[in-house]
Design a protein with these regions (language model features):
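Membrane-interfacial helix-loop segments of redox and metal-homeostasis proteins
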Residues: 1-144
Length: 144
């Protein structure tokens, strides 16, 4: 595979994640009171919900910013992988608990069942891993 094809694949993965993070962060911020209420109702995070209500959308937007900066893309992909893994772990805990709480994700993602959301997250974890595999480990600051 040519170097440019690898870059295009890495770009597509990064832009998919940017769209996801900007969309969900924006939806959470526009429906802030609902997002806060939903986080407060989750059993394992009630004591930190006041911090998470701000931290989650800020981290999502920060990850998107890192992904857009080509020189910081690998860092953004690692941040994205960490966020998606944490979100997926939480979803797995929710599925295992048998509780029927609403998803606190923003926009149409929030309408998914927990099982659908688990699959959705696993797909985006896969996209992130593909992005890491195909993104260059070193970025040239200038072309010669």
């Amino acid at each position: 595979m040519q170097h440019t094809s690898r870059n295009r694949i890495a770009d597509a993965c990064a832009y998919s994640l940017v769209f996801l993070f900007v969309y969900t962060a924006t939806a959470k911020l526009f429906q802030f009171n609902l997002f806060q209420f939903q986080l407060d109702s989750f059993p394992w995070i009630q004591h930190v919900a006041a911090v998470l209500v701000w931290a989650i959308p800020v981290l999502e937007l920060a990850a998107a910013g890192l992904l857009l900066a080509r020189r910081l893309r690998r860092t953004g992909l690692y941040v994205s992988l960490t966020l998606m893994a944490l979100f997926t772990l939480y979803i797995s805990l929710m599925l295992g608990s048998g509780k029927h709480l609403p998803c606190s994700c923003g926009g149409v993602v929030g309408w998914m069942t927990w099982r659908q959301h688990l699959v959705f997250n696993l797909v985006f974890i896969g996209i992130t891993i593909v992005g890491l595999v195909y993104s260059p480990s070193k970025i040239k600051f200038y072309e010669t």
